Amino acid sequence: MPITTVVFDVGETLVDETRHWTDWADWMGVPAFTFFAAMGVIVERRRPHREVFDLVRPGYDLAAAQASRKAAGWAYSLERGDFYPDAFPCLADLRNNGYHVGISGNQPEAAEASLRDVGIAADFIASSTSWGVEKPSPAFFDRVVEVAGCPAGEIAYVGDRLDNDVLPAKAAGMTAVFIRRGPWGIVHAGWPDVARADARLESLSELRAALEAVG
């Protein structure tokens, strides 16, 4: 079955989240290097990323901190400079070559507007928050199929994580594309399950050729 639709994860697939996590380190009053080292530990332990806050500062009240940041005027946003340099060219190349493009990851609902505001070229944009279900739940990938409007076998899902992206996408019947970048991508590239990805990339510039090879 030929691939007609390509759906992307957001964080560390299209977007470099360095600014986002540096903002959190600054808010907590810890050096960014310390915060990033702690994140690496969380990734290696295969723990949810939110546990980094408690590792850096045991007992940290994340909900209270989020409320305080909001009260101080912080709001979720994406800037064009947050995107990896290959993101926009890749999306444009896919659409110019007849693929339908979607974007959906574990993101707040505000990410949808932010993605549109920076001029992302996509046929649909969605978030786990608006759908009410997060990866790696099979229900998330059921929603991808529903919104894409085509069989799972015609969809390629691209992400930087094996646990959240590659393995559940394959279980849903999609072509699973792994990109080795960001904290999860670097660590997960060393896991045996990386062999289950249908394609492995170092850059999104390699994606269309990879799709043609597997499709």
Range-by-range predicted roles:
Residues M1-V6, F88, A92-G215:
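Asp-based, Mg2+/Mn2+-dependent phosphohydrolase catalytic module
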Residues M1-Y99, P108-E112, A121:
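N-terminal helical cap/lid subdomain that shapes the substrate entry/recognition surface
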